[in-house]
Amino acid sequence: TLDYVVTKMPRFPFDKFPTASNYLSTQMKATGEVMSVGRSWEESLQKAVRSLEDGKDAIRIPRFESWSDSELLDYAAKSPADRLYALGELLHRGMDPARICDATAISIFFLSKLKNITQFEEELRQNVGSADHLREAKRLGFSDPSIARIWNTTERAVYDLRMKENILPVYKMIDTCASEFESYVPYFYSTYGGSENESVVTDRKKVIVLGSGPIRIGQGVEFDYSTVHALRTIRAQGYEAIVINNRAN
């Protein structure tokens, strides 16, 4: 079996077209997508949310805090592009996932996983400065900035505590064969849900190429073309090339 979870999430251009309808139907509205990998469903989802690069780093956003329960439920039932954040707010308030399922037809499985995130957020809020809770928060995919907001502190303070407690990510190899037979691919994902680092560090000089992220208005496949040629040039010069990206090319 596979020991990782992959999440693909669409990138919608409504930030460029604020007057366009954000309700989803059979008409294609996404310009691109992101792909994230984690050891748990919760970690993978929260990494995907951040990878969209639209200013959000959690499944709850300030926009929905002033909405009533009925407004949020009605809105989520209409399949808007941002209903994930409406669901996050409803679950944060303690609404029964079964009620949300009845209104939206979203599987209880997915709602229960979202509830795991919102429930732990409250537990984290009650345990400010706890190294054990910080370790679990990172395992569930919470970012340092989101933890800082929950604890009402600075991102630097969260980072310093992580360093002090040695709460660091490891890199796991993508197993494309589900352990059916031994394989090696130079394809890794970062996670806080493990202790063994599977990446092999060589003594060669290295150059990192940052990928352009999800396709959006004004940023398309021409950046992938540039990335490929950058990699070829780096290798031709005798360096080891490393790509960091939040979208599968």
Where are these regions (language model features)?
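ATP-dependent carboxylate/acyl-activation modules
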Residues: 1-249
